[in-house]
């Protein structure tokens, strides 16, 4: 964005030659998701109201006029985005407004992407599905004002079971996945907490790394490789 309009233009540059190899793709949201084979990128186009309502697939090196529309949101109130799942098996398309969401998915190896609906949108219901270790995790506020996390083995029959139950006055956050671990957050009594669960044993414990009573923890996965037992943690507090 060179005008401050937040309509972003995408350029693709080849690292070896430093040459721009694709004609500019204009009026996008700025986000890019690469295919695993690096042959394609997925991006969203902005409409005249500055809402991302269309997801396109662009084949690198081809004309932009050949870009394939793979998803379009019909509601002017909703915006869309696309991302790769943590286990790199699926692409998830998220469409939402301020208090309602809906999600679609398709496999990374689909030559002709055909997004499939996970759950029909319901006014006031927010949900976000992620996949890891042959399971699907749903972070949702359906029948759970402060959210919960459900789990299922398949998105076809969707036999959801409770993974992290809703609790009074506890805000349940989402999950970060590693090969052997699931790290999640929650907030209670205005304090943020991190918990780590061993996938094999199911044992979960709180991550505490400060003697201070009030602090805000955070987690960041700097490396792409999730086959690790190490993560980068940080925190801030009135003292630190």
Q: Residue spans of the language-model regions?
A:
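Peripheral, non-catalytic segments that deliver or gate enzyme domains
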Residues: 1-240
């Amino acid at each position: 964005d060179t005008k401050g309009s937040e309509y972003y233009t995408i350029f693709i540059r080849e690292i070896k030659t430093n040459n721009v190899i694709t004609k500019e793709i204009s009026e996008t949201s700025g986000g890019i998701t690469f295919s695993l084979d690096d042959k394609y990128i997925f991006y969203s186009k902005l409409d005249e109201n500055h809402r991302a309502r269309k997801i396109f697939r662009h084949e690198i090196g081809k004309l932009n006029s050949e870009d394939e529309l793979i998803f379009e949101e019909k509601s002017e109130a909703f915006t869309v985005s696309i991302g790769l799942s943590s286990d790199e098996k699926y692409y998830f398309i998220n469409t939402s407004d301020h208090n309602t969401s809906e999600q679609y998915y398709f496999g990374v190896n689909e030559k002709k992407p055909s997004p499939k609906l996970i759950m029909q949108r319901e006014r006031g219901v927010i949900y976000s599905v992620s996949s890891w270790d042959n399971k699907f995790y749903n972070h949702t506020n359906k029948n759970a004002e402060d959210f919960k996390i459900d789990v299922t083995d398949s998105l076809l029959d969707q036999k959801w079971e409770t993974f992290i139950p809703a609790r009074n006055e506890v805000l349940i956050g989402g999950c970060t996945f590693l090969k052997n671990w699931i790290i999640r957050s929650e907030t209670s009594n205005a304090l943020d907490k991190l918990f780590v669960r061993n996938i094999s044993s199911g044992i979960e414990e709180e991550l505490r790394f400060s003697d201070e009573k009030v602090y805000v923890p955070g987690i960041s996965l700097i490396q792409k490789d999730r086959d690790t037992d190490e993560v980068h943690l940080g925190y801030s507090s009135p003292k630190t």
